[in-house]
């Protein structure tokens, strides 16, 4: 069963937990703020596995993030320092979260090819003398996230060879009923009618975005809805809170 404070389809939750337990790779797709990253942390916590987080969409230097750097010291000369990623993949049963893989530089995909391959499972440290290979430890699971939707202009088309190394879980935005239940649990002091009105407005915006000719272009995520509710708690009206976000 999924955690009570987290809304996810039971079958998808079971599949996610099963893949982490067996050290298999999962790609979580869906709009920003729909719970992809949260689901990974909650599933890992459920299994008592450590999560190592790497935001590949934010790095402009994938070699430094995934392999390491060569440095020069005037006393000892040139030396190589391994990245945190190198040490993370050597920890048994670790969960490696590759956030925003869809925004990563293609060089990151090239580096990850052998790492994610279910048979090869190694990383070559080609920046280091003799280019040693690091084997991925037993039970390590790689969870990637990818945002989808027309508002994600920085998103790249992921290489087919990379996609084939993952099983897919599509995460959806919450229904109005589920979102209301979530907000009611998080903000029990907010008036019920206010929460219902908020969920209705958000639901109408999402429906508009999913039409053939939407007048709006930016999806309101569950994360955004929670932020609006926080502002309402602090005395903002629904309209003012929505405008600020």
Can you say where each PLM-predicted feature lies in the sequence?
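Alpha-helical lid/collar subdomain of P-loop NTPases
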Residues: 1-6, 22, 175-245
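AAA+ P-loop NTPase catalytic core and its hallmark functional loops
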Residues: 1-196
């Amino acid at each position: 069963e999924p955690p009570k404070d987290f809304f996810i389809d039971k079958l998808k939750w079971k599949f996610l937990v099963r893949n982490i337990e067996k050290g298999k790779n999962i790609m979580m797709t869906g709009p920003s703020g729909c719970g992809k990253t949260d689901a990974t942390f909650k599933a890992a916590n459920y299994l008592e596995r450590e999560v190592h987080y790497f935001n590949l969409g934010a790095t402009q230097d994938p070699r430094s993030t995934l392999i390491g750097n060569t440095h020069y010291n005037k006393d000892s000369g040139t030396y190589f320092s391994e990245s945190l990623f190198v040490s993370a993949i050597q920890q048994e049963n670790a969960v490696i979260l590759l956030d925003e893989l869809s925004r990563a530089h293609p060089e990151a995909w090239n580096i990850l090819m052998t790492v994610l391959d279910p048979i090869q499972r190694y990383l070559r440290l080609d920046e280091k003398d003799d280019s040693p290979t690091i084997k991925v430890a037993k039970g390590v699971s790689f969870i990637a996230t990818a945002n989808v939707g027309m508002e994600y202009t920085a998103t790249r088309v992921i290489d087919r060879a990379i996609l084939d190394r993952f099983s897919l879980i599509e995460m959806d935005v919450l229904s109005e009923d589920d979102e209301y239940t979530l907000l009611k649990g998080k903000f029990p002091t907010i008036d019920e009618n206010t929460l219902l009105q908020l969920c209705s407005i958000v639901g109408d915006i999402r429906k508009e975005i999913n039409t053939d000719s939407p007048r709006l272009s930016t999806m309101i995520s569950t994360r955004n809805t929670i932020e609006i509710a926080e502002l309402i708690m602090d005395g903002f009206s629904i309209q003012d809170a929505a405008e600020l976000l």
